Design a protein with these regions (language model features):
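N-terminal, polar/charged subdomain of small-to-medium soluble alpha/beta proteins
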Residues: 1-98
């Protein structure tokens, strides 16, 4: 799986990039058909508390999955996105198995 990480309005640290890659790679446990993952990290409103936004778009063979979440930290936002994508992938698998 090819993973692209884009940071908007700030420079992402190597530690953050490594964290994101590690989390996104875990999605391969749920589907072997994931071709590409695009992650966008962005600071929404610097003056507010919940201002870190993460959006993850997966290109899965013949379909796409997307999750976008806002939280206090990028790590928390990415975790929420990954959990949402896991549910989407599992629902798709269940429909496919019927």
């Amino acid at each position: 799986m090819e993973i692209t990480i884009q940071s908007v309005n700030f420079d992402a640290t190597e530690q953050l990039k490594t964290f994101v890659e590690k989390k996104v790679k875990k999605l391969e446990r749920f589907s072997d058909d994931i071709i590409q993952a695009e992650v966008i990290l962005k600071v929404v409103k610097p003056e507010t508390a919940n201002n870190k936004e993460a959006a993850v778009k997966l290109n899965i063979r013949h379909k796409e999955a997307f999750a976008g979440k806002i939280a206090n930290t990028f790590e928390e936002a990415v975790d929420l996105c990954i959990m949402a994508l896991e549910k989407q992938i599992q629902k798709t698998k269940e429909k496919k198995d019927r």
